[in-house]
UniProtKB/Swiss-Prot annotation:
Transit peptide: 1-70
Protein name: ATP synthase delta chain, chloroplastic
Role: This protein seems to be part of the stalk that links CF(0) to CF(1). It either transmits conformational changes from CF(0) into CF(1) or is implicated in proton conduction.
Localization, UniProt: Plastid, Chloroplast thylakoid membrane
Matching Gene3D superfamilies: N-terminal domain of the delta subunit of the F1F0-ATP synthase
InterPro entries per UniProt: ATP_synth_OSCP/delta_N_sf, ATPase_OSCP/d_CS, ATPase_OSCP/dsu
GO cellular component: chloroplast thylakoid membrane; proton-transporting ATP synthase complex
Primary localisation category: plastid
Top-level taxon: Eukaryota
Family: Belongs to the ATPase delta chain family.
Subunit description: F-type ATPases have 2 components, CF(1) - the catalytic core - and CF(0) - the membrane proton channel. CF(1) has five subunits: alpha(3), beta(3), gamma(1), delta(1), epsilon(1). CF(0) has three main subunits: a, b and c.
Keywords: ATP synthesis, CF(1), Chloroplast, Hydrogen ion transport, Ion transport, Membrane, Plastid, Thylakoid, Transit peptide, Transport
Species name: Spinacia oleracea
């Protein structure tokens, strides 16, 4: 991770990444792995990847506050590079869709550890990436971007970079993200009403809804929005029961729900 500790090297690599995104990469074609994919979700079969990744020896970012700041800075630079290309080519929405697919893929621990493992060769990683690209239908510049992360040994930061891209995308498009948590899946009409409500409260140009299922709420739903979900609207039965318990001075009683 020497490059993370060398600002000059970091700037050089990031500049190269921005320039390289505008061109298609030429790569060798190593013998592909026989991996199982689901065409609907574009995810790996975790067992096959665990077999491929015998050792989870990953390149971890430098610890402590300094390490966190350096990781954040690096992620921001790469995410901004991808956003710049998407903005110039008029593919922001499509690129954000690519990023959402990649977030789901790399949230699978075996997938992430496979790519972050420095013991596994770049050719092998590219071979597996080719399958991801084909199955997920990624745009050429998004596919090229992930190849750049592999070549520049920044693939271990892919989660941070993808999350940072979402933040950059939201700022560019004036989008407010609202996380709606409910006991059961809400109908699209209900989600549309919630989106309108959040838009009215925040004044955002666009509102994007993310849904989470949490049976512990008993009934109703909660809405989190704002900077890192700092704002909360709690319409759950669980919250109402807690308020009733507080009014009856039953704070020390645990409600079985």
């Amino acid at each position: 991770m020497a490059a993370l500790q060398n600002p000059v090297a970091l700037q050089s690599r990031t500049t190269t990444a921005v320039a390289a995104l505008s061109t298609s990469s030429t790569t060798s074609t190593p013998k592909p792995f026989s991996l199982s994919f689901s065409s609907s979700t574009a995810t790996f079969n975790p067992l096959r990847l665990k077999i491929l990744t015998a050792s989870k020896l990953t390149a971890k970012p430098r610890g402590g506050a300094l390490g966190t700041r350096m990781v954040d800075s690096t992620a921001s630079r790469y995410a901004s590079a991808l956003a710049d290309v998407a903005d110039v080519t008029g593919t922001l929405e499509a690129t954000n869709s690519d990023v959402e697919k990649l977030i789901r893929i790399f949230s699978e621990e075996p997938v992430y550890y496979f790519f972050a493992n420095p013991v596994i060769s770049i050719d092998n990683k590219r071979s597996v990436l080719d399958e991801i690209i084909t199955t997920s239908g990624l745009q050429p510049h998004t596919a090229n971007f992930i190849n750049i992360l592999i070549d520049s040994e920044r693939i271990n930061l892919v989660k941070e970079i993808l999350n940072e891209f979402e933040d950059v995308f939201n700022k560019i498009t004036g989008t407010e993200v609202a996380v709606v948590t409910s006991v059961v899946k809400l109908e699209n009409d209900h989600l549309a009403q919630i989106a309108k409500g959040v838009q009215k409260i925040t004044g955002a140009k666009n509102v994007r809804i993310k849904t989470v299922i949490d049976p512990s709420l008993v009934a109703g739903f909660t809405i989190r929005y704002g900077n890192e979900g700092s704002k909360l609207v709690d319409m759950s039965v669980k919250k109402q029961l807690e308020e009733i318990a507080a009014q009856l001075e039953m704070d020390d009683v645990t409600l079985a729900v």
